[in-house]
Amino acid sequence: IGIYANTDNGLERVDYVETDISGERTDVPDLVGRPRRDVVLLNDGDLTFAKVRLDEMSRNTLVNGIDRLADPLARAVTWSLFWDSVRDAEIAPQELVSLALQGIGSEKDMAAITTVLAQAAVCSGRFMAPELREAANMKLVTGLAGLLKDAEPGSDAQLIIAKTLIG
């Protein structure tokens, strides 16, 4: 379990507790009495296959600042849990589209950029209710155009964004 706090350098891990999960609920005595931080991330370090969900405070922090999450592996776990949440119909597909457009511009991992933008395209084109699809596609195209404009010229990120934009 990674504990993250907002700092001048972004969302940084300030504590880590190894825990074995057994059953539907597991007490974590090592965290009792410690101050609540901005993000509590289960499966931090991606040590096992697990469907992870966020508590409300962690979710709100990451929705408004996934790009501030300093650790690339923690970001990958976070991107994955948001995708799982869409596939399990726990969050709306347009939320993942918005999150991708807001957070992917500062992502440095090309695999993450490729995966997240592909997932945003799936959300916009297939997972969206038919009556919302046109607006979602317009939002995605407009957002991708902005990301393309802001990307470093000739970079891998620019190429990935361009490929996503043209489908």
Label each region the model flagged.
Residues 1-167:
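Non-catalytic accessory/interaction domains
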